[in-house]
Amino acid sequence: MPVETISIPVTSRFGVTVYNVLLAHVPPTGRLLVQLPGKGYTCQHPLLYYLRQAALALGCDVLSVEYGFQAANAELDVQNAAYLMDDVWGAVRPVLERGYRRVCIAGKSLGTPLAGELARALETPEVSLILLTPIGGALQGLDDIPTLAIIGTDDALYSPEVVAAFDQHPRITWKVYEGLNHSLESGGWRASLAALPEIIGVCEAFLESERA
């Protein structure tokens, strides 16, 4: 199935125009994956790059979002952090006009609370979440939204208590990887590469489970 590349420009309050990328199948499939990156972990880093490839192979269109502070090489602080959701909505709104019936939002670190906020606000019939190294209150208030949460035990933000607190949630599935850090990598490149297909495979299975 052919895939076209569509640029989604967003005039950001960080003072730049960001050109987000939508990879869309022809003809449309009705399924969308939105990628919300981390602060320093963009959509071109391994986890999000290969998740994009897996999602495309499953027939999802993929919107890869870039934040204005990243394009502007600006510092993110308490005052301008509120602009992030403006960047996200600026990219997502015109894409949703294509009429998707199923949307999965994949957030990495900084992108995880933004993903949760977006998921709660969408009026799309079916919405799900992939939270890669969730931070803050990203898992709060998700209610009946199907969610896959992934973290490593060497992540400074890993908390067995937090995992346990959501262990009985009927719609949240945790995958905890021994020895992986906040980038879901290990100390050596071989171990990091070995972990990558397993993580992407879990995400792929989750997307398949949400497949029409």
Would you name each region that the model predicts?
Residues 38-39, 67, 129-138, 152-154:
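Active-site nucleophile loop of the alpha/beta-hydrolase fold
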Residues 94-95, 198, 202-210:
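C-terminal alpha-helix
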Residues 143-144, 149-151, 155, 163:
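Short beta-strand/loop motif that positions the catalytic acidic residue
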Residues 7-98:
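Serine-hydrolase catalytic machinery in alpha/beta-hydrolase-like enzymes
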Residues 152-158, 181-183:
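Acidic catalytic loop of the alpha/beta-hydrolase fold
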Residues 159-172:
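Conserved loop-alpha-helix segment in the C-terminal half of the alpha/beta-hydrolase fold
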